Design a protein with these regions (language model features):
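Nucleotidyltransferase catalytic core that binds NTPs
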Residues: 1-273
């Protein structure tokens, strides 16, 4: 039996854990298609331009493990109408209860589509995303970091690194981030950062470090026994290279390059948004 086709619609600008929890809950009802609002629709709805352009929002959402596909809507389209998408016939439109739309509900009724609202309580908590099925014979790759403002640059890094093997991301625990970066860090607590990272379809599993210092992931590395430790050029410090050499782990340094056509992002800059 084919899975149920579910549609959700919105701007999904500056995606946070709450947005991903909504997508996760929607995905439990069937395959999720995101009808993504264009920049003009966000400007009209909020009075301000989106923080991230349509192409970047589309790239980010396409990497979310709870999303089957993303369809950008045309400028001028009715954002509350059931979109006409070739070969796609949804049986369910899902909204958060706080975003209930009588216009959407009426449109769904006209087309025989169920309209369902998810209560806010259903998005409570930050459950650890379950590990993806391991591919036999693939190497284990680990990356580490703070991931305090998860953005398209992180997604691109994960996309590239996951080509080397099954990717495990070890997120720095709160106390260690404060130790390394000072007061005011991290912006987001460790459970939320792990949830954001673990929602990527490129990530086999996201974990929280339990060690200290620049190689705070040592206990997790000892348990996982990865063959590759990957960093970007900014992360090539703190004795990681020597740590890997002493343990026979291949050490790879990747350049910080955004996905084609997208701007370069950094968490430090985004904290000023």
């Amino acid at each position: 039996m084919s899975p149920r086709q579910v549609i959700v619609s919105g701007g999904f600008d500056n995606v946070r854990a709450r947005n991903l929890r909504f997508l996760e809950e929607a995905s439990k009802l069937g395959e999720v298609t995101v009808a993504l609002w264009p920049d003009e629709a966000i400007q009209h709805a909020t009075g301000t331009a989106p923080k991230f352009p349509l192409a970047e929002r589309c790239y980010f959402l396409n990497a979310v493990r709870y999303v089957s596909r993303v369809v950008p809507l045309a400028a001028g389209a009715d954002m509350h109408a059931l979109p006409a998408l070739d070969g796609f016939q949804p049986s369910l439109w899902v909204d958060e209860a706080a975003e209930a739309s009588p216009a959407r509900q009426a449109g769904c009724q006209r087309h025989g589509v169920e309209y369902r609202l998810l209560p806010a309580s259903q998005m409570d908590g930050l459950p650890a995303p379950p590990p993806l099925p391991a591919a036999p014979g693939r190497k284990k790759v680990i990356v580490t970091g703070c991931y305090d403002w998860f953005h398209s640059g992180h997604v691109r890094f994960f996309e590239e690194v996951s080509s080397y093997g099954d990717l495990y991301v070890i997120v720095g625990h709160d106390a260690n981030i404060r130790l390394l970066k000072g007061e005011g860090h991290p912006l987001l607590p460790q459970d939320e950062r792990r949830y954001l990272v673990g929602s990527s379809k490129y990530v086999q599993q996201a974990l929280i470090s339990t060690g200290e210092g620049w190689v705070d992931a040592d206990p997790e590395i000892q348990r996982l026994q990865p063959q590759i430790y990957a960093v970007n050029e900014d992360g090539d410090k703190g004795g990681k290279r020597e740590y890997c050499a002493a343990r026979g782990i291949e050490y790879r340094v990747l350049q910080r390059t955004p996905a084609p056509g997208l701007p370069r992002r950094s968490s430090t800059d985004l904290r000023g948004f």
